[in-house]
Regions:
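Catalytic core of membrane glycerolipid acyltransferases/transacylases, capturing the structured
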Residues: 47-107, 130-136
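Non-catalytic C-terminal accessory region of glycerolipid acyltransferases
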Residues: 1, 5, 43-45, 70, ...
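Short acidic/polar alpha-helix capping motifs at helix-coil junctions
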Residues: 6, 28-31, 56-59, 75-78, ...
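Short, flexible loop segments at the rims of nucleotide/cofactor-binding pockets, characterized by
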Residues: 28-33, 81, 98-104, 142, ...
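Short capping/connector residues at structural and topological boundaries
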Residues: 29, 34, 38-40, 63-66, ...
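Membrane-anchoring hydrophobic helices of lipid-metabolizing enzymes
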Residues: 1-55, 92-94
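Residues in well-ordered beta-strands of folded domains
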Residues: 36, 79, 180
Length: 234
């Protein structure tokens, strides 16, 4: 009962923040979102391979992408599914692009993603969405589910490191976000085995973040569309 109450409060706060987002400033976002280890982002940027930033529909995921945009001098693009209502899509896109964040439609513009990484930029993506049934199967919260392997493929092809980060809502209404580096130095080359293993690592690390504050995760109703419990998973 308490869990549902906390979750409803979290959903309501996220919705209100989305409505208020046109009024945010760069300084306001830095005040709302404190990144605990910005030095990790800065260290990885020195490699000049670009960065793949994965978040989840957790806390205020819209602020997560905005925060990494205002905290970094590098170009940032985010992969998003277009809204079915064109007017709503234009409004949300305008809000998201206020501080230089570039929206790339899901499923297209692979060249734009590669260009961003080659220029040392950041590609942001929500990593907790339900993937097509033909995707790699990974265990997530004890269920075998298809998971997007795109981040792993881009990372293995370009050498861009993957980091995870979720905005965790605090009692005062502000957020903290801590980056976690997904290790991949031991994975040499693009192969089915390496793609599966790197996907498995980021999925399991995302689960670990969610477990710390499960009431702030918004996507549980859509993550298990294609459960394959009888299928062997990583």
């Amino acid at each position: 009962m308490h869990f549902q109450k906390w979750r409803n409060q979290s959903v309501g706060a996220t919705f209100l923040e989305l409505l208020w987002s046109p009024n945010f400033t760069k300084a306001g976002i830095k005040q709302r979102v404190r990144i605990e280890n910005i030095e990790l982002l800065q260290h990885l940027q020195e490699k000049k391979k670009g960065i793949i930033f994965l978040t989840a529909h957790f806390g205020s995921w819209e602020l997560a992408s905005q925060a990494i945009t205002v905290y970094s001098d590098a170009p940032v693009c985010t992969i998003a599914k277009p809204q079915s209502n064109l007017l709503v899509d234009r409004i949300i896109t305008r809000w998201r692009e206020l501080f230089g964040l570039k929206i790339v439609a899901m499923g297209i513009n692979v060249r734009e993603i590669l260009r961003t990484l080659q220029e040392g930029g950041i590609v942001a993506l929500a990593a907790d969405q339900s993937a097509p049934k033909e995707s790699v199967i990974v265990n997530f919260f004890g269920r075998n589910v298809p998971s997007f392997q795109g981040p792993a493929i881009f990372s293995l092809k370009t050498g861009a490191p993957i980091i995870l980060g979720c905005t965790v809502r605090q009692e005062n209404g502000n957020y903290t976000m801590r980056f976690v580096h997904v290790p991949s130095d031991d994975l040499d080359g693009v192969s089915d085995e390496n793609i599966l293993e790197l996907t498995r690592r980021q999925v399991h690390m995302t689960e670990a973040i969610i477990r710390q504050n499960p009431e702030q995760w918004m996507w549980m109703h859509k993550r298990w569309k294609h459960v394959q419990d009888k299928t062997k998973a990583a």
